[in-house]
Structure formats: C-alpha cells, structure tokens
Amino acid sequence: EITAIAWAWIRPNPIVSCYLLGESAAHDMLTAFVAAYKQADLVTGHYIRGYDLPMINGALSEYGLPVLDDKMVQDTKIDLVRRAGLSGSQENLGSMLGLHHPKVKMDQTKWRDANRLTPEGLTLARERVIGDVLQHIELRQRLLALGYLCPPSLWSSGNPHQPEAVYTP
C-alpha cells in the first residue's frame, strides 16, 4: 500500500504536492500523481525505476486503473556513474555532497505508525516524502553539475496496449 506520495516540478523554489492515505483516498492520490506524470516530459527520482514507478504501477493495477505510460526517466541511483566503495543511497550522497536538505529519517517503527494512519505517523510520513523530494532535486542538480549522472533513459511499464515509445536523441 502506498501511504504517502509526493512530487514537484523542478524550478526555483519548488512547490511539493503531497498526498497521504488517511487524508486522501488511495484512488485520488494515484490519479493526482498520474495527471502530473502525464504532463512531464521527464521524471526523476532516487531509485525511481527500481522502486517508485513499479510500486505505483502495482497500486494502479490493484485499483483497476491504467498503468503508467512510457516515460523518459533519470534515476539518481541507477544512473549514477560507476563507482566502488561508496554507497549510492540518497542519504549518503546528500551527506557526502553537503546538501542543504537533509534526509528525514524514518525507521520501521515510524513507518508502521504511518501505515496505521496514526496522526504522528502521518506527520512523519509527510515530512519524509516532502524532504525526499526536496533533497532529490538538490542532489540531482549537484550530480549533473559534477558530471556524475548518465543521461535519462526510457522507462516502460510493458503495457501491451500502448504503442512502444521510441527515443531519438
């Protein structure tokens, strides 16, 4: 189950959209995200191809909604230059690069509170997902400036009813 979802358009002073289960119905959270996703030429996140987009597709499927369309994606974990001896976690990269936005820590107990929709848990979940978005925006900008990110690539849900998108540089 998706307890919280957040996103922002990358611009100076981004405004983060955030939805929490318990405050919004899951269907409404998903349709709001999909509407923003469809407007974007490119989406970016930390392990977004490996976790976030597949997780959202699972939730969309559970609610009988169409899965996500193909999209150009830049993933600050998967698209990070090859390296050894260095964790690729967003928290570690943020610390190493001295980012202004810190990683909001949530251990399993705090996530369980959020998943149980307790007021305290939802407050923490909101802080976490908004913090993740803001830190990610800063992280991506820094990684791009340093030349540490590979180019975006096409992500596909594998939807057989959607014509395959073709990327032409």
Regions of interest found by a model, annotated:
Residues 1-12:
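Acidic, metal-ligating active-site segments
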Residues 93-163:
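Acidic, Mg2+-coordinating catalytic module of metal-dependent nucleases/exonucleases
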